Amino acid sequence: MIHDLMLRWVVTGLFVLTAAECGLAIIAKRRPWTLIVNHGLHFAMAVAMAVMAWPWGARVPTTGPAVFFLLAAVWFGATAVVAVRGTATRGLYGYHGLMMLATAWMYAAMNPRLLPVRSCTEYATEPDGSMPAMDMTAMNMPPNSGSPIWFSAVNWIGTVGFAVAAVFWACRFVMERRQEATQSRLPGSIGQAMMAAGMAMLFFAMLFPV
């Protein structure tokens, strides 16, 4: 969860715009079923990340979404291996697989039974199967909160990695505008940039209270 109201709305806006782009791509014209699945998974991810930025997002179940996005990561990974050609395209699908995996990670981090990174005393204060919405310690875990080094390392990798990805996609969008290029198979470069920026902010919120 993000505590700063302005930043919370920024993150929400990024993911809502991305979800709108994916939704329009599904209904705008007929596409192969595999592309509909791709856009649908990105739509679901954008909605889930927008919800996660808000306090009431902690009240939603976490096990189901974690498993769902883990399977989504498997889908993109399998597609990259068996269904697409070209190194660049495979790399793109692999990137989206990692993004789905990162979403699954965030949901797992919210559930101490899926990802036990906190102390036993913290677990004892939580109700069965969920995390209290007002506290949401797992989503705002600063370095001094007792989380292991590997947990913080993963979140740092997510923060830096998606920040770099956001810059990459933003630059690519500018280049495409100059060349009048378009994207049709997956969210366009501006959508990719917004998703990556939102993910970087949420990963940062898992490292420091913002």
Swiss-Prot record:
Cell location: Cell membrane
User: What superkingdom does the record give?
Assistant: Bacteria
Q: Name one GO cellular component term.
A: plasma membrane
- Give the membrane topology, semicolon-separated if more than one: Multi-pass membrane protein
What Pfam families does the record tag this protein with? DUF5134
Work out whether the entry's keyword set contains Isomerase.
Answer: no
UniProt-listed InterPro entries: DUF5134
Q: Sorted alphabetically, which keywords does the UniProt record give?
A: Cell membrane, Membrane, Transmembrane, Transmembrane helix
Please identify the protein, giving its name as recorded: Uncharacterized protein Rv0970
